[in-house]
Swiss-Prot record:
Stated name of the protein: Zinc finger protein 222
Native source species: Homo sapiens (Human)
Gene3D superfamilies associated with the record: 6.10.140.140, Classic Zinc Finger
PROSITE patterns reported in the protein's UniProt record: KRAB, ZINC_FINGER_C2H2_1, ZINC_FINGER_C2H2_2
Zinc finger (C2H2-type): 145-167, 173-195, 201-223, 229-251, 257-279, 285-307, 313-335, 341-363, 369-391, 397-419
The encoding gene: ZNF222
Length: 451
């Protein structure tokens, strides 16, 4: 009996899958297997025992791309070198209810490579019942361990422990390239693909590549056009529940993400992150041709399309072309007459949210854009940009009829209407026509004030 309590090496009691057995698992299941192996090993360290550091044999790596046996054992070996303990007794490796014959039988299967346990789904044989249970739970989808914070369920307690790092804010994994930290190794691996440009997950329908499987799943729903989540207020449909929850903030006005520097609030965390780069002046994306920096990749792409002159989105009604599908969508409302954005003050409708926001300032009198040179205030960012050109005497546009230099495109249009006599803005009450829509709006506002 005393012999059963002698010290042994970790490999004497560890049971691993062969490369053939690992070949039956997809990358996510292989990662879970690795995490379970590492978690079990760390649990052995945590009970205060000791483990011998010698690793006499390491299984050869197979042809699998992710997490071969060799990689798993190398991870365990690295943990061993960080540990100050060196041995653990057999009495700590097994449950108290195990009798000597059960312990002896379990150890003997490792040395003899006997595999008495067969999986019902995969028909593979395993040397230990605990590893027989691993694929059984993977196939059955049983998730008995639930997170108290968010309610998410997991097959294994070790997977739950890894998930709980997200709530605790523990970030053990650091990117060697940019220094960004992550709570899970899988998230670090996905992030590293940003630097390498690797996109291993391909769409079978269009061939588009993605860095992670979840992004591919979202993309595939675009082909299926499946949008099961509907907004009760406006009827807009979404592919995912989290998209619907974000959309609800438009109706409620909730802005939970606040900038610590200037106090500005945002509906989305991504919008806050983008805004914070304005304060840090961090522009990660550079134009190779012109050297101009941008906060995110989308802005760089928009800038490049300006120089290339690409306008792939065409209106079927009038033939007008646009750089972005969102611009085309807004433009089509001109033809359909749809004005989904309504002013609560006066009931006036607009085809875009930016148009409604601009209109709101006529009611509030807000002029949030101030000129540093003369102190003049403006309602819109584009107005102050055009105004600043007056101070620097910059007039990039030229009238084709008279050659007059002008500050902005709207002034150029006004000048051309002077030559042509065109007055496109018409008052519906009196029939009088105006050169600019702004002039008509001013007259209408004065008329309403008199009433």
């Amino acid at each position: 009996m005393a012999k059963l309590y002698e010290a042994v090496t970790f490999k004497d009691v560890a049971v691993i899958f062969t490369e053939e057995e690992l070949g039956l698992l997809d990358p996510a299941q292989r990662k879970l297997y690795r995490d379970v192996m590492l978690e079990n090993f760390r649990n052995l360290l945590s009970v205060g025992g000791k483990i011998q550091t010698e690793m006499e044999t390491v299984p050869e790596a197979g042809t699998h791309e992710e997490f071969s046996c060799k990689q798993i054992w190398e991870q365990i070996a690295s943990d061993l070198t960080r540990s100050q303990d060196t041995t653990i007794s057999n009495s700590q490796l097994f449950e108290q209810d195990d009798n000597p014959s059960q312990i002896k039988a379990r150890l003997s299967t490792v040395h003899t490579r006997e595999k008495p346990f067969q999986g019902e789904n995969c028909k593979q044989f395993f040397s230990d019942v605990s590893f027989f249970d691993l694929p059984q739970q993977l196939y059955s989808g049983e998730k008995s361990h639930t997170c108290d914070e968010c309610g998410k369920s997991f097959c294994y307690i070790s997977a739950l422990h890894i998930h709980q790092r997200v709530h605790m804010g523990v970030k053990c994994y650091k990117c060697d390239v940019c220094g960004k930290e992550f709570s899970q190794s899988s998230r670090l691996q996905t992030h590293q693909r940003v630097h390498t440009g690797e996109k291993p997950f391909k769409c079978e329908q269009c061939g588009k590549g993605f860095r992670c499987r979840s992004a591919l799943k979202v993309h595939c729903k675009l082909h299926m056009r499946e949008k099961p989540y509907n907004c009760e207020k406006c009827g807009k449909a979404f592919m995912h529940n989290f998209q619907l929850q974000k959309h609800h903030r438009i109706h409620t006005g909730e802005k939970p993400f606040k900038c610590e520097i200037c106090g500005k609030s945002f509906c989305l965390r991504s919008s806050l992150n983008r805004h914070c780069m304005v304060h840090t002046a961090e522009k990660l994306y550079k134009s190779e041709k012109y050297g101009r920096g941008f906060i995110d990749r989308l802005d760089l792409h928009k800038h490049q399309m300006i120089h290339m002159g690409q306008k792939p989105y065409n209106c079927k009604e009038c033939g007008k072309s646009f750089k972005w599908s969102s611009y085309l969508l807004v433009h089509q409302r001109v033809h359909t007459g749809e004005k989904p954005y309504k002013c609560e003050e006066c009931g006036k409708g607009y085809i875009s949210k930016s148009g409604l926001d601009f209109h709101h300032r006529t009611h509030t009198g807000e002029r949030s854009y101030n000129c540093d040179n003369c102190g003049k205030s403006f309602r819109h960012a584009s107005s102050i940009l055009n105004h600043k050109k007056l101070h620097c005497q910059r007039k990039p546009l030229k009238c084709e009829d008279c050659g007059k230099r002008l500050v902005c495109r709207s002034y150029c249009k006004d000048q051309q209407r002077d030559h042509s006599g065109e007055n496109p803005s018409k008052c519906e009450d009196c029939g009088k026509r105006y050169k600019r829509r702004l002039n008509l709006d001013i007259i209408l506002s004065l008329f309403l004030n008199d009433i």
